[in-house]
C-alpha cells in the first residue's frame, strides 16, 4: 500500500472488542459488528483478541478478512504476527513490549503494513527509523479498554507528529464528544474501540464519527 493510500485508510481506524458481545452489543457476532462498522464508514479494521485461544483467533481472523476484502478495507492484526502472516492480512500493529519491528518485517515482508504504539517522541523516532509505516500514539484520553495504557498529552501528540514523517493515529478514549480537541494536532486519523463497538447502533455511531474525522483530517491539510 502506497503511503498516500495508507494515510487515507487511517482516518477512522476501528479496533474490535468482543467484550461487548451479549452486553450492549447490537450484533450476534463480531463479524456482524465489523460489517456494520465498515458500512458506517470505518476506513480500517484492527482485529484485537487478547483472551481467546490461538485457533479461535485464527478462525475469526479469516472471517473478518473475508468481510474486509469484500469491502476493500484494510485488515490489521493486533500483536500476532503469525496470524497476520497466515491470513495474509494487510499488516500488524505491535506495542513496545511485543515482537521487535525488524523481526516482524522479516516475517511479513516489505509490502505489509506495520504500525507501532508509542508514547514518547523518542519511541516514535526509533519506530520510524526501524521502518514503521505508521504510529499509534496514546492513550490520549482515559480509557477502560486498555487499563495498562499510560496517558499521553495532546502536547506530546503534537510533538510526535512534528518529529516524524510517517502518519500518526491518536488512540485511547476517543469519542464523538472529545474528538474536536485533536483538531490541528497533525494526526492522520483516530483509532476507536468503544465509541464504535460498544454502541447499540454501530453503523450510525460510525457514520457520525466518520463525519467528525473527515472535518478533523481536512483541517490538517489547510
Question: Which residues fall in each region the model found?
Answer:
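Mid-sequence acidic-hydrophobic segments that form the walls
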Residues: 138, 163
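Glycine-rich beta-strand-to-loop/alpha-helix junction loops that act as flexible
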Residues: 137, 169-174, 190-194
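Glycine/threonine-rich flexible loop motifs
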Residues: 145-149
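Internal alpha/beta core interface subdomains
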Residues: 185-189
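Conserved N-terminal beta1-alpha1 strand-loop-helix module at the mouth
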Residues: 1-99, 106-133, 152, 159, ...
Amino acid at each position: 500500500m502506497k503511503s498516500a493510500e495508507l494515510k487515507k485508510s487511517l482516518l477512522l481506524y476501528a479496533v474490535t472488542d468482543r467484550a461487548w458481545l451479549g452486553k450492549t452489543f447490537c450484533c450476534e457476532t463480531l463479524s456482524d459488528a465489523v460489517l456494520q462498522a465498515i458500512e458506517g464508514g470505518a476506513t480500517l479494521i484492527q482485529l484485537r483478541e487478547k483472551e481467546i485461544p490461538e485457533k479461535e483467533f485464527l478462525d475469526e481472523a479469516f472471517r473478518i478478512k473475508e468481510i474486509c476484502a469484500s469491502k476493500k478495507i484494510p485488515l490489521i492484526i493486533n500483536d500476532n504476527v503469525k496470524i497476520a502472516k497466515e491470513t495474509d492480512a494487510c499488516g500488524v500493529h505491535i506495542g513496545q513490549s511485543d515482537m521487535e519491528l525488524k523481526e516482524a518485517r522479516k516475517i511479513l515482508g516489505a509490502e505489509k503494513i506495520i504500525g507501532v504504539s508509542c508514547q514518547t517522541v523518542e519511541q516514535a523516532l526509533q519506530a520510524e527509523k526501524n521502518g514503521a509505516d505508521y504510529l499509534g500514539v496514546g492513550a490520549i484520553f482515559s480509557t477502560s479498554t486498555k487499563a495498562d495504557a499510560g496517558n499521553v498529552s495532546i502536547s506530546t501528540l503534537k510533538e510526535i507528529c512534528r518529529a516524524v514523517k510517517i502518519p500518526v493515529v491518536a488512540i485511547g478514549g476517543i469519542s464523538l464528544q472529545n474528538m474536536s480537541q485533536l483538531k490541528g494536532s497533525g494526526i492522520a486519523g483516530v483509532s476507536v474501540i468503544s465509541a464504535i463497538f460498544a454502541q447499540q447502533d454501530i453503523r450510525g455511531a460510525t457514520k457520525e464519527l466518520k463525519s467528525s474525522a473527515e472535518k478533523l483530517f481536512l483541517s490538517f491539510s489547510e
